Amino acid sequence: MKSKRHLKILNIIKNEDISTQEELVERLHESGIDVTQATVSRDIKRLGLIKVPDGKGGYKYSLPNEKTYGDIISWLKKMFQDFVIDMDFSENIIVVQTMPGTAEGLGSAIDNAEIEGVIGTVAGDDTIMIVTKPIEKTPEIFNKLQDLLI
């Protein structure tokens, strides 16, 4: 549940200007996640969120830009192990089946990992479609993603 909550927090932070923990608690409640301000405070620390200027004279939560590639891959590996149910590929498309409610956050994490050959993702509730280029790299990318499950 914690990882699902973390994904939701990252998705909210990415798409909205959240300036207080109370705002974040409210957005999580609106998403059906029951959480306290104390839990959100711990989540913010664990996720490494920082406050940055929002361009309107205030501040908002954000992920630090200094995340290393190794940090991103480690985090992606944990998310794959927690959420991925099955994977397959055809031509230049890799399809990843996930636990319900986790595909969007995981798709965003794949995009942020900037994996060579991945040109983008499309995610629904429990399915991610990863588009690769060139087509010849698809099996190699698929194997790299499968390695994250181990």
Curated annotation (Swiss-Prot):
Question: Which is one GO molecular function term here?
Answer: DNA-binding transcription factor activity
Q: Report the leader peptide range.
A: none
The biological pathway it contributes to is: Amino-acid biosynthesis; L-arginine biosynthesis [regulation]
Q: Which UniProt keywords apply?
A: Amino-acid biosynthesis, Arginine biosynthesis, Cytoplasm, DNA-binding, Repressor, Transcription, Transcription regulation
Name the domain of life this protein comes from: Bacteria
Q: Which GO biological process categories is it annotated with?
A: L-arginine biosynthetic process; protein complex oligomerization; regulation of arginine biosynthetic process
Looking up Pfam families in the UniProt record yields: Arg_repressor, Arg_repressor_C
Output the Gene Ontology cellular-component terms.
cytoplasm
Q: Where in the cell is it found?
A: Cytoplasm
**InterPro entries in the cross-refs:** Arg_repress, Arg_repress_C, Arg_repress_C_sf, Arg_repress_DNA-bd, WH-like_DNA-bd_sf, WH_DNA-bd_sf
Could you say which protein family the record assigns here? Answer: Belongs to the ArgR family.
Q: Which HAMAP family match?
A: Arg_repressor
Q: What does this protein do?
A: Regulates arginine biosynthesis genes.
The protein's matches in NCBIfam families, at most eight in alphabetical order, are given as:
argR_whole (TIGR01529)
Designated name of the protein: Arginine repressor
Q: Give the species this sequence originates from.
A: Halothermothrix orenii (strain H 168 / OCM 544 / DSM 9562)
The gene name reads argR
